[in-house]
Amino acid sequence: MEIPKSHDEWLQLRLKGIGGSEAAAVIGQSPWCSNVELWKRKTGRATAPDISNNEAVQYGHDAEPLIRGLFAIDNAHKYKTEYLGEFDMVYHPKYPFIFATLDGRLTELETGRRGILEVKTTSIVRSMQKEQWWKDGKPCIPQQYFIQVLHQLLATGWDFAVLHAQLKYEYGDNPDDIRTERRSYLIERSDHLEDLEYLEEKEVYFWTENVEKDICPGMILPEI
């Protein structure tokens, strides 16, 4: 584990590998960044936009410790919840360019198993956004967040992850009618071994064959 002393130092360290929020871009599943754009950023040809002043980003940053605290209280019978630090970075034991900054570390009280806590906040202002969290009438995780959790499991080697999301509904006729809902999704490492192997293979190839050799990857278009 490495503990950067500042946000700027953390950003510089992120240039040396692939972080959790970037994993989906490697395989063409990010709605915000293509694999080619990510390659440009990692090779110094482009700079990631500064989104620190974005209202949704600020809300998520400020809400995270509160939501993590509520999760810890609600699940005190099941998990010990720990906060590692805002900039603490956990590295893959074999591939140090695969790393993660975690929202929390969980210890399952009954078994002692280690797990990841990933906190998400999202504002749903139209019905199409709600559909990302529902599939066939059942709650689900948006693909880019699922890939982020898989990446974190790769970096840590831990047994499971819990994605704890607050959904804030803001669409409707009344702008003051805001409802919130919190959901927890359990992702077991043992249930996704093939997915983990696939993601690791793609991330290793992207870094060693594209970034380190300075060869632009072919553009991966998202499935429609």
Language model regions located:
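Long, amphipathic alpha-helical segments that form or neighbor coiled-coils/leucine zippers used
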Residues: 216-224
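Charged, glycine-rich intrinsically disordered N-terminal tails and low-complexity linkers that flank
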Residues: 1-62, 66
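Acidic-basic catalytic patches of nuclease active cores, encompassing PD-(D/E)XK
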Residues: 57-83
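Nucleic-acid nuclease catalytic cores
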Residues: 73-102, 106-211
